[in-house]
Amino acid sequence: MSKTHLTEQKFSDFALHAKVIEALENKGFHYCTPIQALALPLTLAGRDVAGQAQTGTGKTMAFLTSAFHYLLSNPAMADRKVNQPRALIMAPTRELAVQIHADAEPLAQTTGLKLGLAYGGDGYDKQLKVLESGVDILIGTTGRLIDYAKQNHINLGAIQVVVLDEADRMYDLGFIKDIRWLFRRMPPTPQRLNMLFSATLSYRVRELAFEQMNNAEYVEVEPEQKTGHRIKEELFYPSNEEKMRLLQTLIEEEWPDRAIIFANTKHRCEDIWGHLAADGHRVGLLTGDVAQKKRLRILEDFTRGDLDILVATDVAARGLHIPAVTHVFNYDLPDDCEDYVHRIGRTGRAGASGHSISLACEEYALNLTAIETYIGHSVPQSKYNPDALLSELPPPKRLTRARSGNGPRRTGAPRNRRRPG
């Protein structure tokens, strides 16, 4: 983490369990981020917390540190059974659940607490095998958790810690009934440590906190501006006919180390992927139609640097921490103002700088006024020369098979591309 992203508060200054401190120091975590510095004194005192912070500022480690400390410092129920986890962490998407599990593994290795993972799409029997051996901390999506609970593969009667991550997204995706179903099968609220984290603490999220938490303390870390001051924002007004050529020209000119391109529909994403893959870019596609195993592999390839560009719908816009994203392209301006903030928040994280480029085409330009009102400033406009756009581009590839991942590898230097004139 960048030092500009940290506070002067050390983890070692808190009365954290020694094994938790050891795990944090092994990972190089010595100083707290602002949300960690605010949340930990409360959770260590046994207080419930509803936290708001800009994405990428350490929310996950705040609740993981709290959960591991609590379980190590408080004994399990005397009659706890093997199918009863002690902590439950709920996430809105499979990708976020997998990421939280990965972040928790170093803590689990040091402390000896066992992790379980439960998400839909695939891996039912593999996940179940882990659960049947007994887990302390279960991380998952609500649908698969309910499935296991209804079949008595898990029992929530011994839960001591509950975490609800990206609570606003849970509402957006219609999971609130599932959340309440799971809460009703846990011990009473005062008998648990309850944590809720969200990019926004809207009225409905606060209502959920009031309903399911024990006099939760609200902690908020407000950014200087909603879009983050380290993100350079830029806006172009292309015609529909020039939009794809402008995107490809900007990619050639910027030559980003790692970029995410967002579009509003899966069909638009597939079209963008096809053009970039045909043009020789190392590009992956992430939409709801991509099989779960392939989604995880694409994310791993992108994080590892085997892919330079990821084309995605908003399924990837919330919660995922992919380090070192240098550029975000809004091929379509989103219909939801918050999605603009979450999209461009994939770059400029943890003290790094980033570049966001948005294309306000004829179809989605009307969304700009609401977006600028929401973020509190105008997005700087840039102009382009239509005659300087790339030409003679190859026809796009089509998804004629069940593949949706990697295009051909591109070489390390920009190719010469003919331009008119």
Swiss-Prot record:
Keyword ATP-binding tagged: yes
Catalytic reactions of this protein: ATP + H2O = ADP + phosphate + H(+)
Record-annotated Helicase C-terminal domain positions: 245-390
Subcellular location: Cytoplasm
GO biological process terms on file: RNA catabolic process
Amino acid composition bias (Low complexity), ranges on this chain: 405-414
GO molecular function, one term: RNA binding
Pfam families from the UniProt entry: DEAD, Helicase_C
Chain intervals for the UniProt region annotation (Disordered): 386-421
SUPFAM superfamilies membership: P-loop containing nucleoside triphosphate hydrolases
Top-rank taxon, per record: Bacteria
Position of sequence motif Q motif: 9-37
Motif DEAD box location, chain numbering: 165-168
GO CC terms of this entry: cytosol
Keyword terms: ATP-binding, Cytoplasm, Helicase, Hydrolase, Nucleotide-binding, RNA-binding
UniProt: ATP binding residues: 53-60
Role played: DEAD-box RNA helicase involved in RNA degradation. Has RNA-dependent ATPase activity and unwinds double-stranded RNA.
Subunit structure, interactors included: Component of the RNA degradosome, which is a multiprotein complex involved in RNA processing and mRNA degradation.
NCBIfam families attached to this UniProt entry: PRK04837.1
Family designation: Belongs to the DEAD box helicase family. RhlB subfamily.
Descriptive protein name: ATP-dependent RNA helicase RhlB
Organism: Enterobacter sp. (strain 638)
Phylogenetic placement of the source organism: Bacteria, Pseudomonadati, Pseudomonadota, Gammaproteobacteria, Enterobacterales
